[in-house]
């Protein structure tokens, strides 16, 4: 049953036209629903159906980049801690992921009244690094190691309804929501990087 907030995690396809995956979690860590979509109009309908007053969306995909930069400034915060990242810059986007969905999704959500990097008390959306979240919260270093024990780790964290997660895309979507709960509990795990147009949860500074 939904509370006053719906926490939405998205494992977003980087290239437009590919399938994206999502989860909806309530404030009590119960996994209410999983879904997938290809068109943003489908996502819009799903969001409209959510009865909760406040909707917070955590997106596992780049939502901003600086032209001419090999490594994004926000991603460097993970590298400083010795944590690997998925490289992303203008050249990579144009070569492998054009047309790129992340930038379109950002414009779409802003047009619907969502605030980029807003507070948890208003409809807001944020960029996250899903496996980076897992590395910081669970101390795992390899994705394969996490996937061997993902259900126990997430259950011990407090999530319920995990039987709905049928593939790794849904798991990544759920991992995307971790910053909300960790920050809500006042643990010093994440900082919100808000510089140069970025809005990414990074290792605590």
Regions found by a protein language model. Give the residues of each.
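RNase H-like (RuvC/DEDD) metal-dependent nuclease/polynucleotide-processing core
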Residues: 2-8, 12-205
